[in-house]
């Protein structure tokens, strides 16, 4: 090919570049300059991106092939069950039409149609959807016929986005080194400045995964074209393949992974931020090396430790029955909504400091908007409203003096609302700029997650100074790729780095127990 040198197009391009430059100047004027520390953190993250992560190309290719074959089989089964009305797991619209005519005149029709119907909050328009939430709601019903249930299960199985990550791995991996570069985005998660991913979404890899030994067995089985259902006792091919995502990331020959993650980082950070007597009681459990999940269950009157675990993970930011049920599902716990409500009530009774903290945060945000440029302190957090910054910005100042910024903050019905999206829709767009309500639970969650991100940035900086080869990091996790003979040394060094409390976080008990892996795991 050759360049298009049409003079008119070149002039148009010049006009576009001028407008683009002016727009960037206008954006820059609205933003404060990055601090030296932020510039260093960005450089550290880019150095990690430059190292990249090595993938097992053969394993990813085999998994991709098996996923394609399974989708074909699922499509054939769908065609048989629906008399040809639906022939692929990608045909959600056809599935909705088929469902309607299957159930409209049956007792199960009303509950199913309620599951697949959503109401647009702005237009109040009723729309039908067959997304993950709708499928989960349908499968929870007791009135389904075997055929309807199987169709939903097929879509739930075949619609998994996890296996698509194998394609992303293969598309982004360097053909010579099999390493994927540039995945980690510095401060990509909006207000909290947590890291995010692009291309290959590392943050939402399935937690459940196979060990290196299981992966080797499964890889050899796929290499010879084995049947995973019979030879590997797999009930769901897609579920099995999803468990290969983490172990598809591997170290170079002669190297190991050293993986360290903080134990219950948010469950420690939240009470520490509250700077309360009740919060200190929770922190004392960690300081004493006791089991927070066991003690939480005991405090609520339950013998099952898992009940304590899901309560700690789901309820710290004001979550109620919905949040608890979502966490229960993730851990395979079944309870009714009534039982979940009892757990919520008991957790809040056992942790009154949390409710006090949520309410105090919400009150501070309201006071800040009513009294601009006045600082309000809650626990270890400070709030101030700056009316001339980005349409009026509520700022949360964290213990390390970094900030969370909530732009275009307004008081509405006694509650602070701010703009949610990073980019405002076009002027001719029908979409309004989405907003969010800054109630106490959201403020607590934002501060907790932002502080965890502060800790991670500081520890990545220290790893960089110590010349430790970080190849990947997630919200509470740091992954090193080290020579096999030095693995024990790096385990001890990474533990020291992660458990050393920064001066600005004095009193926060940190715990990390790095482990050695032949492949990336959990």
Regions found by a protein language model. Give the residues of each.
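Conserved "right-hand" nucleotidyltransferase catalytic core of DNA-directed polymerases
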Residues: 1-241, 254, 266, 325-402
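Active-site palm subdomain of RNA-directed nucleic acid polymerases
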Residues: 31-41, 455-478
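Conserved catalytic palm subdomain of right-hand nucleotidyl-transferase polymerases, strongest
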Residues: 249-265
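C-terminal structured "cap/appendage" subdomains that terminate the fold
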Residues: 462-513
């Amino acid at each position: 090919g050759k360049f298009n040198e049409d003079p008119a197009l070149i002039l148009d391009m010049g006009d576009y570049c001028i407008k683009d430059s002016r727009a960037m100047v206008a954006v820059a004027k609205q933003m404060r300059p990055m601090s030296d520390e932020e510039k260093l953190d960005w450089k550290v993250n880019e150095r990690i991106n430059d190292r990249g992560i090595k993938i097992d190309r053969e394993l990813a290719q085999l998994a991709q092939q098996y996923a394609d074959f399974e989708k074909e089989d699922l499509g054939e089964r769908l065609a048989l069950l629906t008399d040809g009305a639906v022939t692929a797991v990608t045909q959600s619209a056809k599935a909705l039409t088929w469902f309607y005519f299957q159930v409209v005149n049956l007792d199960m029709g009303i509950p199913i149609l309620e599951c697949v119907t959503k109401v647009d909050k702005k237009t109040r328009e009723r729309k039908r959807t067959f997304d993950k939430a709708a499928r989960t709601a349908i499968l929870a019903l007791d009135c389904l016929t075997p055929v309807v249930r199987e169709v939903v299960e097929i879509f739930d199985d075949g619609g998994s986005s996890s296996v698509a990550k194998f394609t992303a791995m293969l598309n982004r991996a360097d053909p010579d080194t099999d390493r994927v570069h540039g995945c980690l985005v510095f401060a990509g998660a909006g207000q909290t400045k947590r890291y995010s991913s692009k291309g290959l979404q590392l943050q939402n890899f399935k937690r459940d995964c196979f060990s290196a030994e299981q992966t080797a067995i499964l890889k050899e089985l796929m290499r010879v074209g084995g049947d995973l259902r019979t030879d590997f006792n797999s009930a769901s091919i897609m579920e099995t393949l999803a468990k290969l995502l983490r172990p598809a990331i591997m170290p170079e020959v002669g190297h190991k992974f050293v993986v360290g993650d903080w134990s219950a980082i948010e469950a420690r950070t939240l009470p520490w931020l509250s700077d309360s007597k009740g919060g200190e009681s929770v922190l004392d459990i960690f300081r004493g090396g006791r089991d927070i999940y066991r003690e939480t269950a005991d405090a609520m009157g339950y013998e099952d430790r898992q009940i304590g675990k899901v309560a700690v993970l789901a309820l710290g930011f004001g979550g109620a029955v919905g949040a608890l049920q979502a966490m229960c599902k993730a851990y395979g716990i079944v309870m009714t909504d009534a039982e979940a409500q009892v757990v919520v009530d008991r957790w809040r009774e056992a942790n009154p400091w949390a409710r006090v903290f949520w309410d105090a945060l919400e009150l501070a945000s309201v006071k800040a908007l009513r009294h601009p440029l006045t600082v309000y302190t809650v626990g270890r957090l400070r709030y101030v409203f700056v009316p001339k910054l980005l349409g009026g910005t509520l700022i949360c100042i964290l213990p390390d003096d970094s900030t969370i910024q909530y732009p275009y903050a307004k008081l509405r019905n006694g509650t602070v609302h701010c703009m949610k999206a990073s980019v405002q829709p076009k002027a001719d767009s029908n979409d309004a700029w989405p907003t969010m309500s800054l109630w106490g639970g959201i403020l607590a969650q934002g501060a907790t997650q932002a502080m965890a991100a502060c800790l991670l940035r500081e520890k990545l900086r220290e790893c960089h100074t110590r010349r430790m080869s970080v190849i990947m990091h997630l919200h509470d996790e740091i992954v090193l790729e080290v020579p096999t003979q030095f693995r024990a040394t790096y385990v001890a060094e990474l533990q020291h780095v992660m458990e050393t409390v920064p001066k600005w976080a004095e009193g926060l008990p940190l715990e990390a127990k790095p482990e050695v892996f032949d492949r990336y795991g959990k």
